[in-house]
């Protein structure tokens, strides 16, 4: 048996087409275009690639974007001042600060400084708290994208045992909340978890987001499981995920590829959040 591939490229394109049509309709009615401010501190190569992709997508969809490429020695105070300015800028609906930030900057303080209704990354404690209380508004982009991918499988998530490998604030923790909201019984594993293999083997739905190439052997996958691989790792010029893809796809019912799985969805859901924030600003 070979798993059905869950294509993020295909779904992301459909979502972006819908966003483009919505924006075109608003502009045709005389409204301004949505505005997204993208802040990059330093010159981390991976961050530059991600930011470039986000800016390109904005241009394709008709979203007005402002770029702030700041030197690595930018102070926390300077960054907070810029965020405050953007919070009060009427033409900006979303503010994105590309992570990771330099060590001398307190990431938590920066995230908390962004107005919750402009927090299109979905990282602000207010937005995470709303998800926790089952009233989500702006949701963390990667977990939100994963939920959209799961919808395309047609599988009923109610009662499925979902196992998440990785407990980061960006993916693992909000992913657990999304799956809980989706009706799953959720197990979160992390660096202190004992006997990871035992947990993975029980997963009807496995989400792996660690950033270690081929961390999960294919033989650990439960028959007919759904496998969502969030990891993106470069080995010898090739991109691979956190799951041993070939072996896993022989046991799973559905699996996301790397690349072309979760990655494109993260950017698509960022644009979706930007549209949502915009709609709330023009129709409060």
UniProtKB/Swiss-Prot annotation:
It catalyses: (6R)-5,10-methylene-5,6,7,8-tetrahydrofolate + NADP(+) = (6R)-5,10-methenyltetrahydrofolate + NADPH; (6R)-5,10-methenyltetrahydrofolate + H2O = (6R)-10-formyltetrahydrofolate + H(+). It comes from the Bacteria. Pathway: One-carbon metabolism; tetrahydrofolate interconversion. GO terms for biological process: L-histidine biosynthetic process; methionine biosynthetic process; purine nucleotide biosynthetic process; tetrahydrofolate interconversion. One of its GO terms (cellular component) is cytosol. The keyword Amino-acid biosynthesis applies. One of its GO terms (molecular function) is methylenetetrahydrofolate dehydrogenase (NADP+) activity. Homodimer. Belongs to the tetrahydrofolate dehydrogenase/cyclohydrolase family. Catalyzes the oxidation of 5,10-methylenetetrahydrofolate to 5,10-methenyltetrahydrofolate and then the hydrolysis of 5,10-methenyltetrahydrofolate to 10-formyltetrahydrofolate. PANTHER family: C-1-TETRAHYDROFOLATE SYNTHASE, CYTOPLASMIC, C-1-TETRAHYDROFOLATE SYNTHASE, CYTOPLASMIC-RELATED. This is Bifunctional protein FolD. It comes from Glaesserella parasuis serovar 5 (strain SH0165).
């Amino acid at each position: 048996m070979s798993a059905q591939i869950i294509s993020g490229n295909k779904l992301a394109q459909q979502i972006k087409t819908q966003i483009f049509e919505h924006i075109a309709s608003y502009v045709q009615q005389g409204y301004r275009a949505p505005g997204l401010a993208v802040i990059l501190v330093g010159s981390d190569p991976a961050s530059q690639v991600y930011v470039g992709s986000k800016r390109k997508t904005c241009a394709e969809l008709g979203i007005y974007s402002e770029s702030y490429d700041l030197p690595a020695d930018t102070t926390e105070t300077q960054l907070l001042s810029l965020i405050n300015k953007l919070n009060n800028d009427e033409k900006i609906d979303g503010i994105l600060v590309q992570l990771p930030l330099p060590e001398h900057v307190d990431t938590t303080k920066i995230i908390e400084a962004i107005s919750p209704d402009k927090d299109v990354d979905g990282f602000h404690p207010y937005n995470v708290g709303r998800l926790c209380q089952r009233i989500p508004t702006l949701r963390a982009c990667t977990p939100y994208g994963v939920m959209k991918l799961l919808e395309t499988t047609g599988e009923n998530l109610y009662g499925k045992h979902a196992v998440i490998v990785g407990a980061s604030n960006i993916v693992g923790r909000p992913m657990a909340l999304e799956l809980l909201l989706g009706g799953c019984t959720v197990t979160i594993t992390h660096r202190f978890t004992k006997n990871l293999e035992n947990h993975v083997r029980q997963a009807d739905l496995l989400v792996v987001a660690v950033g270690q190439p081929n961390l999960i052997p294919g033989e650990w996958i439960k028959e007919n499981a759904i496998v969502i691989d969030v990891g993106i790792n470069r080995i010898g010029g090739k991109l691979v995920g956190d799951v041993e893809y070939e072996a896993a796809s022989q046991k799973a019912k559905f699996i996301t590829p790397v690349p072309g799985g979760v990655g494109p969805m993260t950017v698509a859901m960022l644009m979706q959040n930007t549209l949502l924030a915009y709609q709330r600003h023009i129709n409060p």
